Amino acid sequence: MRFIHHLSLPSRDLKRAARFYDPVMKALGYRRVWTDKNVIGYGLVDRQDQFALRLRKRERRMTGDGFHIAFVAPSRKAVDAFYQAAMKHGGKDNGGSGLNPEYGKNYYAAFVFDPDGYRIEAVINGRV
């Protein structure tokens, strides 16, 4: 059972967001499942997005300073691939990729900023 059905964020530039999120989400096993002129959505099954970006050009403040999203990764290799894809496609480093024992003995994550400035993370938190 999932805890959250879906999450949607505003984006000032959907084309730029797609260039970033298409390879980043692919590294975690997701793909783009929905596209129209104002929305792109990612998930596992067509038209059933779990994460979406919506065009919002006029919003001054997008989210609060403490806001961030952590995506579940299937492996440490996927976390590293997420980080590399983010760096290659317009993301900015926010802590790199590796073990983070301050969050737990097996907490392996990558932390980046997306092109809209959101703090995003990929994490696997368990024995490998």
Residue ranges and their predicted role:
Residues 8-50:
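Core segments of cupin and vicinal oxygen chelate
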Residues 11-16, 71-115:
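Vicinal oxygen chelate
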Residues 1-18, 69, 126-128:
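N-terminal beta-strand motif that seeds the catalytic metal site of vicinal oxygen chelate
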Residues 43-81:
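Long, continuous compositionally biased terminal/linker segments
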Residues 113-128:
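Short, contiguous alpha-helical
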